[in-house]
């Protein structure tokens, strides 16, 4: 997945992955993590998600990482927020209150950039990546996030041979292998196939959405 792919998706407004409301799993399960107020929460590949503002509204410091400048600009504009913009290494950092959005390639982060993130929220990052990049992504999180880091992970699981991603299928086995050494608790599994015409038309008979509570 080259950066140009995602830049074009945003330029063409092909952002079906963007949700027009705060994610219900986030609202339902985040309180179970019992993170301390003002904890720093990492949101990889965040787009302009409404979830960022929700997390900040709950009293957390939010670090979102997003490749598309258009998405970052859109977030602050749509929320009526003025942002200070500065350069940090390879990233353009947009900051307003408790929200920081780092515009750049997630894989160019340095260990110290996320070393104090004791929370993790991944609704659409892992499933946006093809296999080799997923493996690298999970290695990075496992190596650099601090012990005790807690979060939520949402995945999709379907017959990948029927449909190309993104979103990509990430099965339970791959998640458990990729996050080996983490405590993984499956909180909910939802069958979405009847709500997903694209997958039905491709011949899929199942599209499972899984929600995990994770702890390093």
From Swiss-Prot:
A single GO molecular function term of this UniProt record: thiopurine S-methyltransferase activity
Q: Which residues bind S-adenosyl-L-methionine?
A: 10, 45, 66, 123
Q: Pfam family example for this protein?
A: TPMT
Q: Which SUPFAM superfamilies match?
A: S-adenosyl-L-methionine-dependent methyltransferases (SSF53335)
Q: Where in the cell is it found?
A: Cytoplasm
Its main subcellular localisation, reduced to a broad class, is cytoplasm
Q: Which GO terms describe its cellular component?
A: cytoplasm
Domain of life of the organism encoding this protein: Bacteria
The kind of enzyme this is, by top-level EC class, is transferase
One annotated GO biological process: methylation
HAMAP family assigned: Thiopur_methtran
Give the family this protein belongs to, as stated in its UniProt record. Answer: Belongs to the class I-like SAM-binding methyltransferase superfamily. TPMT family.
**What name is this protein filed under?**
Thiopurine S-methyltransferase
What organism does this protein naturally occur in?
A: Pseudomonas putida (strain GB-1)
Its taxonomic placement starts with: Bacteria, Pseudomonadati, Pseudomonadota, Gammaproteobacteria, Pseudomonadales
Gene name linked to the record: tpm
